[in-house]
């Protein structure tokens, strides 16, 4: 592998430093780890291997598990993946495991949610302040949801402009994909909200007075993200219904045009079939059959009648 999937950090003299082995008050970050890395961390920390593997299943639900020697928190985080030249937004699990001596994060990919912590750009972040670390991760996660929701909103605006000029299947499918993403986001945010509510009442997670404002900010940001996702879902649903009505109306217009063309073309067909396309002298008394210019006159009459019928149909209420 090009980069380490197991990285260890510790706050030393107010700075986040990468270390080579677990220490008291350190942070172990596992991103798409190997079986060997998982086994090593399990032996070093005493965390059950099954719990370390749990967030590597993208169907794992958000929850809080309290074990004898550690507590595991699983939340859904947003992620973006590029496929076919465009970004696709999804949610994946992230676990935060708190032991007596360390805090462990496990995710199936190297998530940008944790990058600022590694870079030491999060204000007031210390690896040994576990409760604050959890809240800071949850706050960062909620802000990432808000950021992606704003991007999705801008993408839906661009799609709306495209759909006004071109009703292509590609744009409509992208609109449906965005709607599906918002449903996933809303479900994940609501699951995370339940986790946050449980954390506030969990005796093992110590509550410090200086972290109360941060906890309030986390809950507020998450609620705002839920509301925003619900609003955008409603807007996209209305937009999808509107464009479905436009497509249906366009189809009706096409059918109307085809019906008018079909009726118009049936008139000369009827006239010519009556004459049998034969202008022989004395043809059962049919008018103009004995005239050399009769064929041209019949064509002219057919065109005039067709034009009159077309004019009538285009103005008829029946075809509007």
Placement of each model-derived feature along the sequence:
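Hydrophobic alpha-helical transmembrane segments and their immediately adjacent juxtamembrane loops
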Residues: 46, 223-320
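Peripheral, non-transmembrane regulatory/ligand-interaction domains of membrane transport proteins
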Residues: 1-208, 214-217, 221-228, 286-289, ...
């Amino acid at each position: 592998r090009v980069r380490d999937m197991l990285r260890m950090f510790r706050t030393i003299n107010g700075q986040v430093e990468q270390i080579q082995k677990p220490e008291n008050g350190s942070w172990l970050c596992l991103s798409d780890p190997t079986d060997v890395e998982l086994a090593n961390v399990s032996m070093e920390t005493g965390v059950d291997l099954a719990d370390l593997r749990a967030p590597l299943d993208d169907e794992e639900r958000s929850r809080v598990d309290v074990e004898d020697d550690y507590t595991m928190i699983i939340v859904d985080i947003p992620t973006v993946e590029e496929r076919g030249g465009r970004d696709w937004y999804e949610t994946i699990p992230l676990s935060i495991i708190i032991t007596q001596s360390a805090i462990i994060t496990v995710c199936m990919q190297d998530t940008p949610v944790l990058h600022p912590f590694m870079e030491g750009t999060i204000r007031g972040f210390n690896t040994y302040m576990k409760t604050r670390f959890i809240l800071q991760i949850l706050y960062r996660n909620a802000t990432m949801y808000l950021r992606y929701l704003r991007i999705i909103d801008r993408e839906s605006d661009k799609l709306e402009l495209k759909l006004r000029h071109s009703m292509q299947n590609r744009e409509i499918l992208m609109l449906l994909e965005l709607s599906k993403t918002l449903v996933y986001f809303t479900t994940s945010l609501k699951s995370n909200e339940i986790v946050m509510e449980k954390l506030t009442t969990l005796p093992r997670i110590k509550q410090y007075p200086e972290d109360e404002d941060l906890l309030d900010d986390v809950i507020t940001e998450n609620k705002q993200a839920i509301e925003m996702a619900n609003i955008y879902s409603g807007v996209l649903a209305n937009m999808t219904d509107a464009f479905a009505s436009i497509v249906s109306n366009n189809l009706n217009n096409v059918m109307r045009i085809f019906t008018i063309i079909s009726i118009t073309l049936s008139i000369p067909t009827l006239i010519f079939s009556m004459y049998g396309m034969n202008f022989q002298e004395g043809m059962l008394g049919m008018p103009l059959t004995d005239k050399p210019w009769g064929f041209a006159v019949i064509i002219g009459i057919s065109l005039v009648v067709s034009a009159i019928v077309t004019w009538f149909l285009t103005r008829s209420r029946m075809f509007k």
